[in-house]
């Protein structure tokens, strides 16, 4: 069955790239929704500064995607809520499967 919520992932030279919108100060860490433009809205319990939120995001994505945090990098948006992230060891199909499996 095809999922109607479409989001675009991109294969890079290595791995895949995703766009993420982070909502801090949430009750629990979760993938909340896929926005119309393909951005993955992630809620985090982080209540501290941006650097800690970025670390928490990488840790949460590593758990969801079943990879080491060292394989995830924030390429753009380190100081904002919208971020471009690469996952070095997974292709876009595998990232999409694991994101959809964890969508709340």
Regions found by a protein language model. Name each.
Residues 1-59, 73-78, 83-104:
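Contiguous, often N-terminal, cationic amphipathic patches that form binding interfaces
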Residues 62:
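The alpha-helix within a helix-turn-helix
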Residues 69-71:
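Short acidic capping loops at alpha-helix termini that bridge into adjacent secondary structure
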């Amino acid at each position: 069955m095809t999922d109607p919520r479409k989001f675009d992932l991109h294969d890079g030279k290595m791995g895949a790239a995703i766009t993420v919108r982070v909502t801090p100060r949430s009750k629990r860490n979760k993938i909340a929704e896929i926005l119309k433009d393909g951005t993955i809205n992630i809620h985090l319990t982080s209540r501290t500064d941006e650097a800690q939120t970025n670390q928490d995001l990488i840790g949460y994505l590593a758990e969801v995607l079943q990879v080491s945090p060292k394989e995830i990098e924030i390429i753009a948006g380190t100081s904002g809520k919208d971020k471009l992230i690469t996952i070095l060891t997974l292709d876009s199909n595998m990232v999409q499967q694991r994101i959809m499996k964890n969508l709340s």
